[in-house]
């Protein structure tokens, strides 16, 4: 893990180049690359944290870095991954991070931070960067060169002033499912996760893996022991588990939840085959909302689906809250090398470079067969 610190943050507009080479006549300080992040840096959400980033590196196969400036008012967590043919590229960790820019940063500050960030990434050998922009924390404005990869992707944010208000805000069908589950004897609990929850033989692990297999999920949604162990080690008490048990204590549904300050995130979940009709997942999410209300959390981010009209998003919508939009962007940092890698990938796929670029995947050299 590395933290990239951009310049002298007391200087309003640092003019930086890689490896500390300040441009002539400019009073900028060096770009410093540290072996590990300094302890105590406040992050705006869990997806910016070293604990989460280190865990996600087991899934992404990359090296986690945090680019940070202005005493933490500019933060960009990334994974650096090797690229076939040489070089590396960067991408936000799985989830919701992007580029945090504190609202107090001026336009000049933001411009300086973007300039220094690009220089630092090039110095780290990055050909391109993919950013997963959080709808929950203030984001830096995009540069004109950014390519929009995903826009208008809906996710649900449930605000929790208190339990009664949250219950009233839910759609009737979801409340009915919760009542049905409770009446049939299902019991839900939310607690701090422990080692037994992340073991391969734990209820959550078994249910999640089985659910992903039933849905034919891509390999990126299957996680190994190292990932879960690192997640528990990195987040500690901020990693929670939710369970719903039926007759005989059999676990019908389970989830991992991430806590950060007054916000809860619905991270991963699974359920037993055929158990959905019992209302177990409705009860699980309602218990998470109740837990949040009890301990003083005010937001529960459920994430989204593929589109507004798909069944997963409609299910999450039934818990009330409001829609917030997630987006992804891409930025080419080394045009020459980028196009070399795209041409090489196009040749492997048997298409032209233009056809691969028009396919819409970013970075294009990581695209699968169109």
Per-region residue spans from a language model:
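Short, flexible active-site-proximal loops enriched in glycine and acidic residues
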Residues: 86-89, 124-128, 149-151
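Active-site/acyl-donor-binding loops of N-acyltransferases
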Residues: 1-30, 80-83, 142-165, 297-370
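Conserved acyl-donor/pantetheine-binding loop and adjacent beta-alpha core of acyl/acetyltransferases
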Residues: 82-96
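A gly/proline- and charged-residue-enriched helix-loop-helix capping module
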Residues: 92-140
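A conserved beta-strand-loop-helix scaffold within acyl/acetyltransferase catalytic domains
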Residues: 2-85, 133-157, 161-277
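Short, high-confidence coil segments that cap the C-terminus of an alpha-helix
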Residues: 62-64, 123-126, 295-297
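Aromatic (often tryptophan-rich) hydrophobic motifs at membrane interfaces
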Residues: 113-116, 227-340
């Amino acid at each position: 893990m590395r933290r990239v610190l951009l310049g002298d943050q007391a200087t309003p507009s640092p003019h930086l180049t890689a490896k500390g080479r300040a441009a002539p006549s400019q009073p900028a300080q060096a770009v410093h690359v540290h072996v590990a992040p300094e302890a105590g840096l406040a992050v705006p959400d869990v997806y910016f944290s070293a604990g989460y980033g280190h865990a996600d590196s087991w899934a992404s196969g990359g090296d986690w870095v945090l680019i940070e400036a202005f005493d933490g008012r500019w933060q960009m967590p990334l994974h650096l991954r090797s690229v076939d043919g040489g070089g590396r590229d960067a991408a936000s960790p799985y989830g919701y991070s992007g580029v945090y820019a504190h609202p107090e940063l001026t336009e000049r500050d933001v411009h300086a931070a973007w300039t220094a960030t690009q220089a630092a990434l090039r110095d780290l050998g990055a050909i391109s960067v993919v950013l997963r922009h959080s709808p929950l924390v203030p984001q830096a404005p995009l540069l004109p060169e950014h390519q929009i990869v995903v826009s208008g992707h809906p996710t649900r944010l449930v605000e929790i002033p208190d339990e009664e208000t949250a219950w009233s805000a839910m759609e009737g069908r979801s409340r009915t499912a919760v009542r049905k589950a409770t009446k049939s004897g299902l019991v839900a609990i939310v607690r701090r996760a422990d080692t037994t929850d992340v073991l391969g033989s734990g209820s959550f692990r078994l249910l999640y893996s089985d659910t992903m297999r039933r849905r034919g999920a891509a390999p990126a949604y299957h996680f190994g022991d190292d990932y879960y162990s690192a997640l528990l080690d990195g987040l500690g008490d901020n990693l929670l588990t939710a369970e719903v048990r039926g007759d005989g204590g059999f676990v019908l549904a389970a989830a991992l939840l991430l806590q950060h300050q007054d916000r809860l995130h619905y991270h991963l979940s699974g359920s037993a085959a055929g158990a959905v009709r019992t209302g177990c997942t409705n009860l699980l999410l309602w218990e998470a909302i109740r837990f949040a209300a009890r301990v003083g959390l005010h937001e529960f981010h459920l994430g989204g689906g593929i589109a507004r009209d798909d069944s997963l998003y409609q299910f999450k919508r039934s818990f009330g809250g409001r829609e917030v939009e997630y987006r992804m962007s891409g930025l080419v940092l080394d045009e020459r090398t980028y196009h070399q890698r795209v041409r090489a990938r196009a040749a492997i796929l048997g298409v032209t470079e233009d056809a691969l670029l028009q396919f819409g995947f970013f970075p294009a050299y990581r695209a699968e067969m169109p």
